[in-house]
Amino acid sequence: MDNENNKNTKNSQQDSSFSEGGIRELLDRLALRSLIEKEEAAAPPKTYEDFKFWKTQPVPKFDDECTQEGPIDPNTDINQVPREPYRLLKEFEWATIDVTNDNELSEVHELLTENYVEDATAMLRFAYISEFLRWALMPPGYVKEWHVGVRVKSSRKLVAFISAVPLSIRVRDKIIKKCAEVNFLCIHKKLRSKRLTPLLIKEVTRRCHLENVWQAVYTAGVLLPSPVSLSRYMHRSLNWKKLYDIGFAPFPLGSTEKKETAKYHLPPNTQTPGLRPMELKDVPAVQSLLSQYMERFELAHLFSEEEVRHWFLYTDKVSSGPVVWSYVVENPESKKITDFFSFYSLPSTVIGNPKYKDIQAAYLYYYASDSCPKDLSSESQLAFVERCKLIVNDALILAKKFHFDVFNAVTVLDNNLFLKDLKFGEGDGFLNYYIYNYNCPKIPGGIDASKSVDYSRPSGMGFVMI
C-alpha cells in the first residue's frame, strides 16, 4: 500500500517552480511504491523495537553493520514451508487472482483505483489502465499464485491485494537468480484497522518460498528495518500552464507566465541522429547494451532477452505505447545500436476540477549507452553525461509530443548527474529500497548525507521499480 511522504521542509524555487503544497508534493505522494499503509507514514519516527512485525522478519536492524554479505536466514528447505495459507479473520478468505481474466483484472483495477493512492487533500488519484496492470503483473515466468487477494466471504468482494513477480538481480558480485519484486500492496480504506498488511506480506512470502524464492526487493517511502539504499524523486514540468491552471504550480516570486512557459519550452523535434522507436529485432542488441551498462552499478536488475521484450516492447512489434515507450539510436553506417531509453505512463485523476480531469505523468525507466565510460577519467565521464542528457532530453521532447504534463524520475542509474541540467526539480519525496532476507553494505542512491541530490558521483542503483 502506498503511503504519504515524510516531507522535507526545504524548497528551492531556483531549481523548480513546484512549491510546497503544490504539484511537487502531490506527485511525490503518487510516485511511491511501498509495503506500508498510509496512516503509518504520518506517524513519528520509530525505533527498531517499534516495528513489531518487521522484528519477526529476516531483515537487517538499523544499526547492523554488514560483516558478511548474504542471506540472513540461510534456510531454504521447501519442506519446512507451510502448505496452508495463513489464517484470516472469519469474514475473509484468500483468493488467487487470475489477471488473464478480464473480470478479475477489473476487480484489481477497481480496488487500486479507489484505494491504492490518494493525496491527503483527495485531489489526485492514480488512474490505472488494465494494460498497465497486465504489463506490471505478467512478465516472463510470472507465477499466478503470487497475485494474492483477500475477499469478503459473504459478498466475494475483493478488499485487499498484493503481488510479486520474478526477476534476477546482482548485488555487487553476487547474483540472486531467483528473486521476487513485491508491489501493489493495497487494502480497502475501511479495513485498514484489521491488520491485514502483515498477513498479506507473510502470505506472499510463503508462496514465494514454495517456488524456492527466498529473497525479494521492495520499496517504501518511509523508513523500515532496514534500507539498502535511499533515493529522491525529481520532476520536470512539460505542460506548466496546465499545472498552473489546476492550481498546483503557482508563479515563483518575480516570475511571469511567459517566463515560466519559456523556461520549460522544448523543441518540436528530437535531436539525436539515428533515433527511432525500438523494434522487435532490436531486443538482442538492447539486452546486450543494457547488460553492459548494468555492470556499472552495485545493485542491478539482470534482464534476459524475454524480459527486455516484455518490459520495453510489451505486446508491440514496434514501440508505440500506451503503457511504455522505448527508443534506440542506430548508427546509420554500421547499423549498430548505440543507445536506448524508455519511459512509461501512469496518469492521475484530478478530483473536483471543472476544467481538467487528469494529469498525464511519464516516468523515466531504463536507458543505456555504449558511451558509458570504461575508465574513471573526467573526460570519459563528462562525455557520457552529455550523451545521457541528449537522449533523455529527447525522451522529454517525445513525452511532450505525446501530451504528457510532467516527467518524473528517481535518482537511480546516473540520473542524479544530469537531470538538473534538464530542468528537473528536486522533489520532497524519497524512496527507500529493501532486500528481504539479505544483508549487504549500504548502496548510494544518488543523494548525499543531507538528502540533496549528489551531482558528484553516480548512484550505485541499477534498479527501477514501477
Curated annotation (Swiss-Prot):
Its EC number is 2.3.1.97. The active site is at I466 (proton acceptor). Tetradecanoyl-CoA binds at F51, K52, F53, W54, L185, C186, I187, S193, K194, R195, L196, T197. Transmembrane segments: none annotated. The modification Phosphoserine is found at S17. It is found in: Cytoplasm. GO terms for biological process: long-chain fatty acid metabolic process; protein localization to membrane. One of its GO terms (molecular function) is glycylpeptide N-tetradecanoyltransferase activity. GO terms for cellular component: cytosol. Monomer. This is Glycylpeptide N-tetradecanoyltransferase. It comes from Schizosaccharomyces pombe (strain 972 / ATCC 24843).
